[in-house]
Amino acid sequence: MDIKEIEELLIQLESKIAFQDATIEELNQVVTQQQIEISRFKEALKIVTERLKSSQSSMLARPEDETPPPHY
């Protein structure tokens, strides 16, 4: 292997590393954005769950609020 071949290989490796660095940065940005979205979804799910629980408990009538059956 002569110097020219080594230089070409070095250039190829540097190019691959630069491409990989750019790809890693893009992936990091995507992961960061997804984490933000996951946090928002978790908060929204928490709110919906709380509302659902409160609406279910308000839909249940207390026994003393129930009208007696017709045979009473």
UniProtKB/Swiss-Prot annotation:
It comes from the Bacteria. Signal peptide: none annotated. InterPro entries: SlyX. Residues 53-72 are annotated as: Disordered. Disulfide bonds: none annotated. Belongs to the SlyX family. PANTHER family: PROTEIN SLYX. This is Protein SlyX. It comes from Proteus mirabilis (strain HI4320).
